[in-house]
Amino acid sequence: MSFGDFSKICQRTPLPLCSVVKSAKQMVLTNDTTIKNSRLDIIDLGIIPVCYARSIDVANTMIFEIGNAFINIVAFFLLIIIIYNVRRKVTAIGRSEYSYFFQTCLVLIIFTLIVDCGVSAPGSSAYPYLVSVQLGLAGACCWMLSVLGLLGFRLWEDGTFKSMLLLYGMSFGGFILNFVVSIVTFKEWIQRKSDMSTDTMGLFTVMYVINALALLIYIICLLIVSVKVLQNYWATGAILLGVFFFVAGQVLIYAFSNNICEGMNHYLDGMFFGSLCNLFAIMMLYKNWDMSTDDDLEFSVSIDSTEYSTFNSDIKL
């Protein structure tokens, strides 16, 4: 696989973007047989994966990736619970920032359900735009994490207008870059190769290089903060476990999706297990923040049967 080429990736993994990018090479058999110079002017179906999870028909509605959809629905409700718990920690560091991040993840889950499950069918006029929005939201989440990682060094005060403006700016920048590069690639507004393959170099670079660098910044910052600053090794374990789940999910999606699909008789593919691992990674991300922060209610009042007291021993009521 050459850098910037989605043909091998899409032949092994049924990513939503594969329906809107084209390649002159199509791998059509499970023994990796490749057909070159396909008539893409006639067969304009994107890059077809060798194996993918079968669809089901419910009330005359075709639903794709039903297993992956189930995991994303679970993730949707789990994120609602996480957002509620984040909002409850009133004085915790990064409360507003992490709340906004998880809210963005919630919107990403909604668009993932739309493009993965066939709510907007591949081939429809709206599909390239919806996939671009999904990729834009994924990029926004990655870019926000780089800011959240730096927040642990207290370079600026959390929850302030400056802090939120920086977070909004980074998320907007990540969304715009990923969305624009995606839609320009899908609609082929800049150039078209002579063999009619989609030029995906820019999209590949943004998705797998720039966004990955943002994630790397977040991981490095959190490890430094948890080990050197907080000396909280439970938090360190949480982030390492999250990294493990995330990497495992990517490997299952991009390397073993065909094997899983064939082994499961087309009922599940790598997308199911990849989404499950990503869900665990998000849970570990939240757990790391939860263990690294306290609800410092210095002037909270507790009431017992005899008298009023506070958690600050210097203050008496």
Swiss-Prot record:
One of its GO terms (cellular component) is endoplasmic reticulum membrane. GO terms for molecular function: unfolded protein binding. Its main location: endoplasmic reticulum. It is found in: Endoplasmic reticulum membrane. Belongs to the CHS7 family. The lineage of its organism: Eukaryota, Fungi, Dikarya, Ascomycota, Saccharomycotina. Interacts with CHS3. It is a multi-pass membrane protein. This is Chitin synthase export chaperone. Chaperone required for the export of the chitin synthase CHS3 from the endoplasmic reticulum. It holds the Pfam family Chs7. The chain crosses the membrane at residues 63-83, 101-121, 133-153, 164-184, 204-224, 236-256, 266-286. Keywords: Cell wall biogenesis/degradation, Endoplasmic reticulum, Membrane, Protein transport, Transmembrane, Transmembrane helix, Transport. GO terms for biological process: cell wall organization; protein folding; protein transport. It comes from the Eukaryota.
